Regions:
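Conserved short alpha-helical segments that host acidic/polar catalytic motifs at enzyme active sites
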Residues: 1-250, 254-255, 263, 269-299, ...
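Glycine-rich phosphate-binding loops that contact phosphosugars or nucleotide phosphates
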Residues: 296-389
């Protein structure tokens, strides 16, 4: 899954973006890149690399003198969907005139039709990606207002996106937007950060805002403004993240798998602390909006998850059947909405996602709600999409 990090403020964006991209490496990727915006309107600096973030970091040190300063920057780790994994197809992508740079997570389903229209207007394409059309569309729609140009471009897209945009014409502005792919905003004094996952920016701030689908963020170092695509102001809740950066780093272990295995006892203890009331023989699950009567009439449990969350769900299936005596099954979330699953009236669906933003699991949640299931989300991020829905 791709990763996004962006920064605007007085500090050097390179270090902030690179450290954020390193924290997103666990998600898997095949290439990485950054776009940097000088404060004086000079051309954007684009550096991309096939391979690891460490390879990108070395290229940046070789390409950019230490005396150079930048007002803003965006970075990306790519997992190839359209176009092979190489330096050209890596993000960021740049508009024809070089004024706009874009990083994008998601899939643009109508990119072929958009690409043909742009080619007829004289636009050339360097990459084989769907994402490059966004950069050219922004240039095509630009009439002096960066947010308006991004909004006009987004209205032409079909599919999913989480994007971040910078422009040499607006060195004091960073624009981000989401539809089906997460964007979180880090709220700080005199600077703004954005990312596709809170883990990328948690070492800088624990005060964040999760954008909703259809939101567009316009950020400067000292202000953030969130509107709809149609420029209607919207208000989003400020969320406090109560875990720290140590929980997402390897902490001396050789790899994350080994760390997770050894941390299981502490993780389980932390999970039940304050929730398991031994003296009363019951539990206190304040975050679960499901009353005891609804629980009592649950006749079947369906678990939907992906990856390692799916493996956790496999264990959960045995525990539900062993301790609760409730028939349970486990589903690959990626297949759930395509197989017309049978959801009976008293089915409880448990969706498991570490980030709370896993696209396939979120789609399974929405399918379960449509079919009348009682849906519970199990995730680590309180303000994530699955937690809210």
């Amino acid at each position: 899954m791709c990763g996004i990090v962006g920064y605007i403020g007085p500090r050097d964006p390179i270090d902030i973006i690179i450290s954020g991209l390193h924290r997103l490496e666990y998600r898997g990727y095949d290439s990485a890149g950054v776009a940097l915006c000088p404060p004086n309107g000079d051309p954007l600096v684009i550096v991309k690399a096939k391979g690891k973030v460490a390879d990108l970091e070395k290229l940046l040190k070789d390409a950019i003198p230490s005396t150079h300063t930048f007002a803003a920057g965006i970075g990306h780790t790519r997992w190839a969907t359209h176009g092979e994994p190489n330096q050209v197809n890596a993000h960021p992508h740049v508009s024809r005139n070089g004024d706009f740079a874009v990083v994008h997570n998601g899939i643009i389903e109508n990119y072929i039709a958009l690409k043909k229209k742009l080619e007829q207007k004289g636009y050339g394409f360097a990459s084989k990606t769907d994402s490059e059309v966004i950069a050219h569309l922004i240039e095509e729609c630009y009439e002096g207002n960066l947010r308006a140009a991004v909004a006009a471009a987004l209205e032409q897209l079909e599919g999913t996106y989480g994007i971040a945009v910078i422009s040499r014409r607006h060195p004091d502005t960073l624009v981000a937007a989401r539809k089906g792919s997460p964007i979180v905003v880090g709220v700080c004094e005199d600077e703004t950060l954005i990312a596709s996952d809170v883990s990328a920016i948690i070492n800088h701030t624990k005060q964040v805002i999760f954008l909703d689908d259809g939101d567009i963020l316009t950020a400067s170092p000292r202000s953030i403004d969130i509107t709809s695509v149609r420029n209607v102001p919207v208000s989003r809740e400020l969320t406090h993240i109560d875990w720290d950066v140590g929980q997402i780093e390897k902490a001396g272990y050789e790899h994350f798998m080994l760390k997770e295995i050894h941390e299981q006892p502490d993780s389980l203890a932390n999970s039940i602390r304050g929730r398991l009331l031994l003296d009363e023989g019951t539990t206190k699950l304040s975050g679960m909006q499901m009353d005891s009567a609804t629980m009592a009439r649950t006749e079947r449990i369906t678990i939907a998850a992906c990856g390692t969350s799916y493996y956790a769900g496999m264990v959960g299936k045995y525990l539900f059947e062993d301790f609760a005596g409730i028939p349970s099954d486990i589903q690959q979330a990626a297949e759930f909405r395509y197989r017309n699953p049978i959801i009976q009236p008293d089915t409880c669906m448990l969706a498991i996602s570490q980030s709370g933003e896993t696209a396939d699991t979120l789609a399974a949640v929405r399918e379960g709600l449509t079919k009348g299931a009682i849906v519970l989300g199990l995730c680590n991020v309180v303000g994530s999409t699955i937690a809210r829905e």
